[in-house]
Amino acid sequence: MKFAAILLVTCVLFSLLPSHLSQGEESSMNIDAQRRPWCPSKKQVFGGSCGNDGAQQCLNNLLSTWDPSVRLSPVSCNCTPQPNNNILCSCPNMICP
């Protein structure tokens, strides 16, 4: 009788485990989406100006919103001034997951 109760409790716990894990994966995916606004267009608007080295400014903006692993791949960006003291950063060779 005790064995049956233990088996039943174990089955219930294992049935709850996958739903708990999938919720964690979903929240992780939402965090990634918030940190990676660049994909799929590979463009994003930031405040500021392009300055003397707009490409580097855009790359710095990219790195501040992207996973550190992006630094392992070569990325070049273009900076285009926009109205209201904004810049459009375009990084066409960036690899999106």
Curated annotation (Swiss-Prot):
Keyword Secreted: yes
Localization: Secreted
Keyword Translocase assigned: no
A GO BP annotation: defense response to fungus
Top-level division of the source organism's lineage: Eukaryota
Keyword annotations of the record: Antimicrobial, Disulfide bond, Fungicide, Plant defense, Secreted, Signal
Disulphide bridges: 39-96, 50-79, 58-89, 77-91
Position of the signal peptide: 1-24
Pfam family, one: SCRL
Expression sites by tissue: Flower buds and roots.
GO cellular component, one term: extracellular region
InterPro entries the record matches: SCRL
Similarity comment text for this entry: Belongs to the DEFL family.
PANTHER family given in the database record: DEFENSIN-LIKE PROTEIN 245-RELATED
Protein name as it appears in the record: Defensin-like protein 245
The organism's taxonomic lineage, starting at the top: Eukaryota, Viridiplantae, Streptophyta, Embryophyta, Tracheophyta
Gene giving rise to this polypeptide: SCRL4
